[in-house]
From Swiss-Prot:
Pfam families: AA_kinase (PF00696), Acetyltransf_7 (PF13508)
Organism field: Pseudomonas fluorescens (strain ATCC BAA-477 / NRRL B-23932 / Pf-5)
Subcellular location: Cytoplasm
Entry protein name: Amino-acid acetyltransferase
Biological pathway: Amino-acid biosynthesis; L-arginine biosynthesis; N(2)-acetyl-L-ornithine from L-glutamate: step 1/4
Source superkingdom: Bacteria
Length: 432
């Protein structure tokens, strides 16, 4: 079977979930200049064709810097913000205008050899962002540098309803007719919040947020962000992370940070279970919970391969439905990726941990430990004093977690009478 067939099948739940959703996408000026920009445009067009309502916000910092240099002007910053005097504003307007035209031209391609063939996109832009001056801070006059006051929510939604891609530039206008230079991150964040967007997607040079060892941080809650901001200082990763967290606190469902340098990063983030960037979300991306009857199908899919290998005892759908209240599960993006069950042994103060299973793709984490802790907590709450486990393949894992070798004779009689001598499972116990 071709690989793309399998990919499409796995992506179909996300295609359905994203249809008619509003995504605000922020692409900095560096991303527009990058060789991968054409692929990003193709991916945005694909999202549009799948029914996603798209608002694209572009940056222009390197383009502004180039125009300042060409005119022999020195850029001035204070606390990371550009000071936009009259001469600088001319460069800003020039850079933003040319960049907007270039982006619109890319989105208008309809060549037979292009992935955009037949797309017939309409790009809409205009005076959709109202701004105000930052003014004077700490004695520094920012002149024409501004901040977003509001976005035209009704106007943008009307354009989205008409199947247009809305393009927002880092310029804002005041009721008095002034033009202000804005940070594209600010425009994107405010647009996402004011529109009640389902997602804010932020492009950066890196795959997402990297920890102190250079390893990708895949998911965060907004309350975890300040610690990372302190570590990052004032670099661009910090700006993106701050914007992502602010959007979530403002009611945006999820914020994502992905790389503009990696071909397909946007699609990987949106149409695969683990993504390829960093997710910031208020709700838990993955959680441990008690199983419900709706989980039976997912449990069967998880444990069937292990049953075929003889690692787990076979359980039919009927058995799982009858015993579903004994199970705890780890759910990730709607998929059951791990499970464990607790059975109280009749006429005793002991319980049995059974059917501990983790999807092979997720065994690198601590999900087994999380489930064990959950089962032990449940056992103590039920007044149980001892936890038994019978295993054929994972004895060392349990011994490393405080279980000690036991025997059939140590099992309560109700469980000992059911012991399968042909299976010859090793028995371990742990005092609670």
């Amino acid at each position: 079977m071709p690989e793309y067939v399998n990919w499409l099948r796995h992506a179909s739940p996300y295609i359905n979930a994203h249809r008619d959703c509003t995504f605000v996408v922020m692409l900095p000026g560096d991303g527009v200049e990058h060789p991968n920009f054409g692929n990003i445009v193709h991916d945005l067009v694909l999202l549009h064709s799948l029914g996603v309502r798209l608002v694209l916000v572009h940056g222009s910092r390197p383009q502004i810097e180039a125009r300042l240099a060409a005119r022999g002007l020195t850029p001035h910053y204070h606390h990371g913000l550009r000071i936009t005097d009259a001469a600088t504003l001319e460069c800003v307007i020039d850079a933003v205008g040319q960049l907007r035209i270039a982006i619109e031209a890319r989105l208008s391609m309809d060549m037979a050899s292009s992935p955009m063939q037949g797309s017939r996109l309409r790009v809409a832009s205009g005076n959709l962002v109202t701004a105000r001056p930052i003014g004077v801070l700490e004695g520094v006059d920012y002149h024409h540098t501004g901040e977003v006051r509001r976005v035209d929510r009704k106007g943008i939604n009307r354009l989205l309803d008409e199947r247009s891609i809305v393009l927002l530039s880092p310029l804002g206008y005041s009721p008095t007719g002034e033009t202000f230079n804005l940070a594209c991150e600010d425009v994107a964040t405010r647009a996402a919040i004011d529109l009640g967007a389902d997602k804010l997607l932020l492009f950066g040079a890196d795959p997402g947020l990297l920890d102190e060892n250079g390893k990708l941080v895949r998911e965060l809650r907004p309350q975890q962000v300040p610690a990372h901001l302190q570590r990052l200082g004032g670099n661009y990763q910090a700006e993106l992370l701050d914007a992502a967290a602010e959007a979530c606190r403002g009611g945006v469902g999820r914020s994502h940070i992905v790389s503009y340098a990696e071909d397909g990063a946007l699609l990987t983030e949106l149409f695969t279970r683990d993504g390829g960037g960093t997710l910031v979300a208020q709700e838990q991306f993955e959680r441990v919970r008690e199983a419900a009857i709706e989980d039976v199908g997912g449990l069967l899919e998880l444990i069937s391969p292990l049953e075929e290998q003889g690692i787990l005892v076979r359980r039919s759908r009927e058995v799982l439905e009858r015993e579903i209240e004994q199970f705890s599960v780890v759910e990730r993006e709607g998929m059951i990726i791990a499970c464990a069950a607790l059975y109280q042994i009749a006429d005793s103060d002991a319980g049995e941990l059974a059917c501990l299973a983790v999807n092979p793709e997720y065994r690198h984490g601590k999900r087994g430990d999380e489930l064990l802790e959950r089962i032990e907590t449940r056992a103590r709450a039920q007044g149980l004093k001892t936890l038994f486990v019978l295993t054929t393949r994972t004895a060392h894992w349990f011994r490393e977690r405080g279980f000690v070798p036991s025997s059939v004779e140590r099992l309560p009689s109700a469980r000992a009478s059911l012991y399968n001598y042909q299976r010859n499972s090793k028995i371990f116990e742990k005092a609670l």
